[in-house]
Amino acid sequence: MIESLHSPHIARVKVLISSRGNKERGEHGQFIAEGLQCAREALAATSGPKIKTLFLTESGLSRIEGAGLDSASVETILVSEPVMAAMSSTITPQGILSVCEIGQNSFADLKLTGKSKFIYLHEIQDPGNAGTILRSADAMGIDAVITSPGSVDMYSPKVVRATAGSLWHIPLYSGITLSTLSEKFPSITKLALSAQGRTSLLELKDVGDCVAIFGNEARGIDTLIGGDVVAVNIPMKGNAESLNLSAAAAIVMFHLTAS
């Protein structure tokens, strides 16, 4: 068991969750996922990010064993509670911390089926929104989540935590420009959620291959609207002026996959 607070393992983890973690995660191709839920999904997944090293406290090991999870195939290191606290980005660690390898999804391999539904996040900055949208996309059966350059790092601790394990269920493609998406799929229907949209979401029926575009929380996506991008709005009967981005995205995804 590792008990020293000077262990190089702590430094290895801290650099991946630090304020400069985006750069480090990209260079090392690794990210941190904490908690039983993420460990369960990663150990069970046949695709997506794989666990490289699993750090456990004694209580964390009990949780893993109690959940019936088989961690024999990954490097497992026992650490003390103080060491886990030093590694963790949460106030109350669960005693389970996974160092995972970032999945290598190739955008070139993404195909259309005639009824494909994608989500495109344009310069989204809030990690909670990004993670929640990915989680909702998983729940609604969306086929892929695509992010633009300048969007929040989808492998940051806060985003990973907000996905609640859905990161292992849905293909993720990061750093893809809208023009690249359009060039690859020229026939795909592009919808942009906007308060100024003239088309009601409820008017959309059988859109076939479709990508729903959600923009920056503060600036929106008005600059993207035009050409072959259809601006849509969510009709609201109440008095609220607007919806939280993740709530609005969930409504759009539900309609697109249910209609």
Language-model features and meaning:
Residues 69, 73-99:
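Glycine/small-residue-rich loop that forms an oxyanion/phosphate-binding "nest" at active or ligand-binding sites
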Residues 1-63, 151-153:
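Boundary-proximal intrinsically disordered activation/regulatory segments immediately upstream
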Residues 98, 136-140, 151-168, 223-259:
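Structured adenosyl-cofactor binding patch, chiefly the S-adenosyl-L-methionine
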Residues 104-196:
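RNA substrate-binding interface of SAM-dependent RNA methyltransferases
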Residues 62-73, 224-225:
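Short, aromatic/basic amphipathic alpha-helical patches
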Residues 191-241:
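Active-site/ligand-binding-proximal alpha/beta "capping" segment
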Residues 1-6, 75-80, 170-180:
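Short acidic-hydrophobic, aromatic-tinged amphipathic segments that line or gate anion-handling sites
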